[in-house]
Curated annotation (Swiss-Prot):
Belongs to the G-protein coupled receptor 1 family. Glycans are attached at N3, N83, N182. The gene is GPR85. It comes from Homo sapiens (Human). Interacts with DLG4 and DLG3. This is Probable G-protein coupled receptor 85. It is found in: Cell membrane; Endoplasmic reticulum.
Length: 370
């Protein structure tokens, strides 16, 4: 079959056996780790009902996208390297594989942006987040992201920003030409804009958390109390909160007349809001690490693409381009490690699932906290 690389590229020499071996070994490792890791995380998210919540629906969608890219697109890259950096499947197959690869890339970028917005809502507007971000809302967001990704990846199939086999990359993807005769620059600019917007949302979230942690000088105002209810201008509200939670004794405070006291609330219930806030921060940290790694691993490849579009002189060095392409491949298998090492809840559910599969769990002995 003909090679579909553009005529402006120089004819590459055949790869040395050592280079081909390193490429095949590393790519095979990436395929195995990505498929197995994302599949295990997906099974865990589906099986454990405690993880059927808004952030983990999005994580399941990211895992499915990475499995799609690793199981379908990467084997064709593997075969092209094995065949000496040549494409032997025809033009239509090349366009389909390139479409799936670009679809997965834009889907991950769009989804990470939507996740950053939901993370900000979870911490800054938690009540709105818990009421509005239901299963159907998450499903609508996921459908919207896939629709936008298809809209971005499909036009090159119709030769708008042509898909072709790039021999230097061993894959079918965008054919990047000079910016004066280029159709792919708009797609790259949009991808860079999405990544920048995602970072700005997380930056706003960091500023929000930092502002709430600032120490302010305390101004003491005397509170009014005849029966230890402490109401009035100087009251901090803690006595009223204790009374509502079922810890108050004596008559109803004057400011809480007509409000029923909750007598069934336990002492642990008082710390639920703080625990949820810490959990949301841990989940936000996990997704930010994913976003940062996506930007880090795709950054060199984006630099190489912009280099080919705007640079007039030398071409992109072969070693840099190969490393950039393989780093973008590695991004598909990095998320499972981030999930396990940065999320305590996922790690606990994962270990619990493995213990449940191996042996029956022993009942815990009763203990008393002194």
């Amino acid at each position: 079959m003909a090679n579909y690389s553009h005529a402006a590229d120089n004819i590459l020499q055949n790869l040395s056996p050592l280079t081909a071996f390193l490429k095949l070994t590393s790519l095979g490792f990436i395929i195995g780790v990505s498929v197995v890791g994302n599949l295990l995380i997906s099974i865990l998210l589906v099986k454990d009902k405690t993880l059927h919540r808004a952030p983990y629906y999005f994580l399941l969608d990211l895992c499915c996208s990475d499995i799609l890219r690793s199981a379908i697109c990467f084997p064709f890259v593997f075969n092209s390297v094995k065949n000496g950096s040549t494409w032997t499947y025809g033009t239509l197959t090349c366009k389909v594989i390139a479409f799936l690869g670009v679809l997965s890339c834009f889907h991950t970028a769009f989804m990470l942006f939507c996740i950053s917005v939901t993370r900000y809502l979870a911490i800054a507007h938690h009540r709105f987040y818990t009421k509005r971000l239901t299963f159907w809302t998450c499903l609508a967001v996921i459908c919207m992201v896939w629709t936008l990704s298809v809209a971005m990846a499909f036009p090159p199939v119709l030769d708008v920003g042509t898909y072709s086999f790039i021999r230097e990359e061993d894959q079918c993807t965008f054919q990047h030409r000079s910016f004066r005769a280029n159709d792919s620059l708009g797609f790259m600019l949009l991808l860079a804009l999405i990544l920048l917007a995602t970072q700005l949302v997380y930056l706003k979230l960091i500023f929000f958390v930092h502002d709430r942690r600032k120490m302010k000088p305390v101004q003491f105002v005397a509170a009014v109390s005849q029966n230890w209810t402490f109401h009035g201008p100087g009251a901090s509200g803690q006595a009223a909160a204790n009374w509502l939670a079922g810890f108050g004794r004596g008559p109803t405070p004057p400011t809480l007349l007509g409000i029923r006291q909750n007598a069934n609330t336990t002492g642990r219930r008082r710390l639920l809001v703080l625990d949820e806030f810490k959990m949301e921060k841990r989940i936000s940290r996990m997704f930010y690490i994913m976003t940062f790694l996506f930007l880090t691993l795709w950054g060199p490849y984006l630099v190489a693409c912009y280099w080919r579009v705007f640079a007039r002189g030398p071409v992109v060095p072969g070693g840099f381009l190969t490393a950039a392409v393989w780093m973008s491949f590695a991004q598909a298998g990095i998320n499972p490690f981030v999930c396990i090492f940065s999320n305590r809840e996922l790690r606990r559910c994962f270990s619990t699932t493995l213990l449940y599969c191996r042996k029956s769990r022993l009942p815990r002995e009763p203990y008393c906290v002194i």
